[in-house]
Amino acid sequence: MLLSLLNSARLRPELLILVLMVMIISMFVIPLPTYLVDFLIALNIVLAILVFMGSFYIDRILSFSTFPAVLLITTLFRLALSISTSRLILIEADAGEIIATFGQFVIGDSLAVGFVVFSIVTVVQFIVITKGSERVAEVAARFSLDGMPGKQMSIDADLKAGIIDADAARERRSVLERESQLYGSFDGAMKFIKGDAIAGIIIIFVNFIGGISVGMTRHGMDLSSALSTYTMLTIGDGLVAQIPALLIAISAGFIVTRVNGDSDNMGRNIMTQLLNNPFVLVVTAILTISMGTLPGFPLPVFVILSVVLSVLFYFKFREAKRSAAKPKTSKGEQPLSIEEKEGSSLGLIGDLDKVSTETVPLILLVPKSRREDLEKAQLAERLRSQFFIDYGVRLPEVLLRDGEGLDDNSIVLLINEIRVEQFTVYFDLMRVVNYSDEVVSFGINPTIHQQGSSQYFWVTHEEGEKLRELGYVLRNALDELYHCLAVTLARNVNEYFGIQETKHMLDQLEAKFPDLLKEVLRHATVQRISEVLQRLLSERVSVRNMKLIMEALALWAPREKDVINLVEHIRGAMARYICHKFANGGELRAVMVSAEVEDVIRKGIRQTSGSTFLSLDPEASANLMDLITLKLDDLLIAHKDLVLLTSVDVRRFIKKMIEGRFPDLEVLSFGEIADSKSVNVIKTI
């Protein structure tokens, strides 16, 4: 029979809860014998211990999502049990062995001591634990519900960007909904504990006052006997109810104060974080032994505690020293263990399964003789800071490495460990940006460096100051190096700036402009936004004003499906900022593309279902480039701030065609000219 019942309970565990609820309701009405009350009291204590241990060892809050319902059931069970014990105390002056034992154990030989101990337990539960847990639950529920729309938008954005699939999005939404419901339930469930504590206090006074009255009138006891008997039973009954209630209250405190994201159980997290810092341990050990030397303090006790802390410090210090001794890469990963065998160029990688497949985004190879000076000058930090100011993008960590075989004036840029560009920078000289042949007439013989089709002129610092007074623009070596690196990094932005980085920028924007971002994401995926930003950056247009870009996207993304045309519309919206970047004061010096040249470009534009591209025959393309080169070469030497001005429909094609020969020449459309800027057309091609 017993085995059959246990098997039924195993197959349908919900029957146990159903039986328990029926029993609880019956206890409110039906008188129970003392032996059954003892069993139910023991069951109450066991359930409280079970809930306590379960809450302590959960790895996340949703692992115990039924806790609010458990609170309701255990609270009802304790109240029903208190009613049954009160009935026995008042009618029979006997509530079973457990209550009598608890009362005798706590009271001992003194009623006053018993009352004080019981009062302390009640105060601790009601004022400290219950009130604190209730407040934490209220705040957690409020923040969880307030943050739900933002989390929902984040899931939708990840789904649109292709970072997660539909199943993963569905699972995340389910978890988010369950968390919100759980925190909302906690806010109300904590009232069960508070109400239970108040009811327990009232029941104690009823048992004490009513018991003495019933004992003297019904059982014929004198005042002394009634006081002794009913005090013992009242305190015993109160403790039997309050101790399980205290365990449940502590369990609730454990759960509501747990931080989501901690992977281990609470005990492990507490010990790991409390004893993680060796410095804290050794200082605490010293303070502990110092306290033991105070007059009247038991020195052996403090010595033992100090020794325990010192032992913990020793193990933690040894562990930290061992970890520090292991060489690490810049990202904190273990370096590859590569052994080259004699006669073979093949390398052997130790523990291949733990090797990251990531490449290093940005590396600068610098001359060995210059590396220390460049590190002192904080080249990497300055590059990242200034690039963010100029372009609005946070560069990945920039690593400086010794460049084998580099001369003292060469710098090599690697993007994702692939060589992109080599720059020549004379660190002891200054570069003349707007050089002209007039410089020679001042008795200055510049150092000339030819890089590609461009010439760079360098002079000494004394000569540079003289030229600056005459109106020439000069850059020191670090500024010139930054300029060269920034142009190359902007041109290759798609190598290190993509969907994930775009998502990070959008998350920051969401905190200030959630409605704007929501409107943009209705019509543009994160991938599409990422491509727009890449195209802007590749032409040296800053994306720091993300609000303006998002406003333009919200306006044009529903109408324009082609990303290239969409970028042109956004550039038009950013006209004031683009003109400010490339204009000389209030004037924009420009070389205008003639209508004849634009017509040649238009005739070569080909459109497919996937993209639009320029397809000129080789002869026409060569003739056009020769014409542009002839017109621009001399002008660009005399005017470094020139831009090429053309119609919006051919702008991007002209830019693509000339960027190999004139990488620093900006091509603007008429729609990108701000009203506040005047245009000085120097020449027409």
Swiss-Prot record:
It is found in: Cell inner membrane. Changing I448T: In strain: RKS2985, RKS2993, RKS2995 and RKS3057. Its main location: membrane. GO terms for cellular component: plasma membrane. InterPro entries: FHIPEP_1, FHIPEP_3, FHIPEP_4, FHIPEP_CS, T3SS_FHIPEP, T3SS_HrcV. Involved in the invasion of the cells of the intestinal epithelium. Could be involved in the translocation of the InvE protein. Changing S369N: In strain: RKS3013, RKS3014 and RKS3015. This is Invasion protein InvA. The chain crosses the membrane at residues 17-37, 39-59, 61-81, 110-130, 197-217, 235-255, 274-294, 295-315. The keyword Transmembrane helix applies. The gene is invA. Changing R475Q: In strain: RKS3013, RKS3014 and RKS3015. Signal peptide: none annotated.
